[in-house]
Amino acid sequence: MRRSIRACGRGGADMSMEAHAVKSVSPLSEFWHTFRRNKVAVVALGVVIAIILMAVFAPFLVPQDPYDLKSLVLRDARRPPGYVGSTGILHLLGTDSQGRDLLSGIVYGLRISLQMGLVAGAIAFSIGAVVGCFAAYVGGRTETMIMRIVDIQLSFPAILLAFVVAAILGQGKSQLILALVFAQYAYFVRTAHGAAAAERQKDYVQAALSVPMSGWFVISRHILPNSLPPLIVVATVQIASAISLEATLSFLGVGLPPTEPSLGMLIANGFQYLMSGRYWIAIYPGIALIILIMAINLVGDQIRDQLNPRLRK
């Protein structure tokens, strides 16, 4: 009898320890445990991390600085992959129309693309989250006016809005970031407004509203934090979209100046040589751009599947 009681006691203790272990799993650990089940998403995440590290340590990885005009040799322009330049540099992917090492240009181009995408995405995220939550909180005519402006803007393609703003502001990094933010912030406003409107009807928010406190405190403390999951999903999509928009605008000549080795500019410089057999000038930067955008989108799709309750299995 005592043995059975001890066994039951041990069994109960084991069960309580297991339950405690299950409860002690952090949300981040649970998220990663689910994320790594998708091998494609894990590979895509590895590609994104590798590209980020490559962009950060670009000066130590490439044989030539594409910003250094003194190192350019025009007689080495449009050389095929594997060409050894007059300065002794091995151009693994060849050279572009200005004699720059194409591999160096691609790595620095990835650096610029990530910078444009992350900065523009972060600014659009911040503006859209605040404006959307504010509109859902105040309601009334203010909400109607804000959302009608957003609806009108969303009726136009993002590339058209970005092109118009970039053409007005001119070439440059700051001008291009403003154009990308203007073209993308409305998506965050719409998403934040929908999530915040749903949160505002919940009991804990209504209880907070019954206490005399500022509206911004309620938004920042209760509404905005619980509206982040759908905004994070939109952010991953919009970062990839911003990178694509930057490349498109640079290709069209209204993005970064010709001295900036962005991927769009490299593709634009090599586009005219496609039919003359010098395919590498445009093809290799295009492949790098496709890999970057595809990897970010695959990671974003997995994050969406995990954060969206309707898509959870």
Give the ranges of each region predicted by the language model:
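Residues marking the start of alpha-helices
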Residues: 31, 89-91, 165
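Alpha-helical transmembrane segments of integral membrane proteins
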Residues: 95-313
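Cytosolic-side transmembrane-helix boundaries in multi-pass membrane proteins
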Residues: 10, 16, 311-313
